[in-house]
Amino acid sequence: MQAANPIWAEVQQLLQKNLSKPSFETWIRPAKFNCFENGLLTLITPNNFTSDWLRKNYSETIEKAAEEICGHNVKVVFKSETNINNNSNSSDSVSQQNINSQSKSFSINQSNNLINRSKKSHSLNTRYVFKRFVVGPNSRMAHAAALAVAESPGREFNPLFICGGVGLGKTHLMQAVGHYRVEIDPDAKVLYVSTETFSSDLIQSIRKDGMHAFKNKYRSVDLLLIDDIQFLEGKEYTQEEFFNTFNALYEAGKQIVIASDRPPSQIPKLQERLISRFSMGLIADIQPPDIETRMAILQKKAEQERMNLPRDLIQFIAGRFSSNIRELEGAFTRAVAFASITGLPMTVQSIAPMLDPNSVGVVVTPKQVIKKVSDFFEVSAEELVSSSRRKPVSQARQIGMYLMRQGTDLSLPKIGDEFGGKDHTTVMYAIEQVEKKLSSDPNVASQVQKIKDLLQIDSRKNL
């Protein structure tokens, strides 16, 4: 498969001018040229989901652009990289998408949550837009599905059910759909509510004989975004009314997006018919972000705040807060506030005691590991991360890789990057060799322990 092609490059340039930036970045840019023979343009996409979406929504657009460039009829076909790699054992064919996108703003029209566009005020968080969402392996599927329903509501995934733990970005994605929808269609009626609000509105309407107004509020919308649906648990009458609301919107072709901390089948005391309705579209889960995604989130937040954070500080914060994004961003905010109030520099040494009192004296960064190892074995840091195969250097490098794996939260590929761009398999081999020697070679065991003592990484939480 060719990495690039002049014709496809020109077609992409033309499409970039004619499509919105989110659409181009999400669907067109990831497509790679495969071949162009006898008027047949074959493109490779990251996965089945992208292939299907391009085929249904962009085939004609791409063909017209290609015909304009080539001067003759062109037919486009899409092949999934997933299928090419024979990766058919994946549990979900839409679980991998290379998506980068942007979006904008929104307005809604009724009561506190459904407001007229001209009022400029609304209940959706202005920060919760697609361009501020950092996509990682943990959230690619959910992000792609959210963008898909934002672009074409009521078609592919209805309802879209986003599930995941607290603080992982469910509400962000849900509200981003609302922002995007009204940016595309200013007259769209978008309603975002929590399940508790839905239940409270229902109770109030019953007490005040206002069911007509209640039904009008919830069933006249084009897009219903309902958060924390797990709170329907055990509320029989609320479930009954939500079932009716769901059916009314679905039958009218309106889009429904639901968020929950668990899949529909795991919500206790939820009616089977609701479980069935919630499962008839797409269930997309969001997992906790890995270290690389957490670092990307912090970097993006720093850029938004126009701050320049040292890489080792970003690594430190990302390594200490791994459970959810909310805690991660809270730690960033505290670090910035602390530095501002005290006048101390934004460094690991100054920020660590505030974020993690137990980390005083045991903060380990990749640079520190490399320095301690190079000093201990009396080789230069440059030589340690080089490709030198001299035995003293290669042995020191293997121990350095082992200690970096033990003392930091970096993945194998990232450790390889720290050691001059080594492949992750090289890092894995080095770690395995050191682990074997620890039990068979007292000299190596002593060397490793001495450097550990210098770094004080035995007391770190991940050991």
Swiss-Prot record:
The record's listing under Pfam families reads: Bac_DnaA (PF00308), Bac_DnaA_C (PF08299), DnaA_N (PF11638)
- Is Cytoplasm among the key words of this record? yes
Where would one find the signal peptide in this protein? none
- Domain of life, per UniProt, equals Bacteria
- Where in or outside the cell is it found? Cytoplasm
Xref: InterPro entries: AAA+_ATPase (IPR003593), Chromosome_initiator_DnaA (IPR001957), Chromosome_initiator_DnaA-like (IPR020591), Chromosome_initiator_DnaA_CS (IPR018312), DnaA_C (IPR013159), DnaA_dom (IPR013317), DnaA_N_dom (IPR024633), DnaA_N_sf (IPR038454)
Cited Gene3D superfamilies: 1.10.1750.10, 1.10.8.60, 3.30.300.180, P-loop containing nucleotide triphosphate hydrolases (3.40.50.300)
Q: Where is this region: Domain II?
A: 84-122
One GO term (biological process):
regulation of DNA replication
Q: Cytoplasm as a keyword?
A: yes
Q: What residue spans carry the region label Domain I, interacts with DnaA modulators?
A: 1-84
Residues annotated as binding ATP are G167, G169, K170, T171
Q: Which NCBIfam families does the entry link to?
A: DnaA (TIGR00362)
What the entry lists under HAMAP family is as follows:
DnaA_bact
Q: How does it assemble?
A: Oligomerizes as a right-handed, spiral filament on DNA at oriC.
What the record says about its domains? Domain I is involved in oligomerization and binding regulators, domain II is flexibile and of varying length in different bacteria, domain III forms the AAA+ region, while domain IV binds dsDNA.
User: What exactly does this protein do?
Assistant: Plays an essential role in the initiation and regulation of chromosomal replication. ATP-DnaA binds to the origin of replication (oriC) to initiate formation of the DNA replication initiation complex once per cell cycle. Binds the DnaA box (a 9 base pair repeat at the origin) and separates the double-stranded (ds)DNA. Forms a right-handed helical filament on oriC DNA; dsDNA binds to the exterior of the filament while single-stranded (ss)DNA is stabiized in the filament's interior.
The Swiss-Prot or TrEMBL record describes its family as follows: Belongs to the DnaA family.
This chain belongs to the protein called Chromosomal replication initiator protein DnaA
Native species = Prochlorococcus marinus subsp. pastoris (strain CCMP1986 / NIES-2087 / MED4)
Query: Gene name?
Result: dnaA
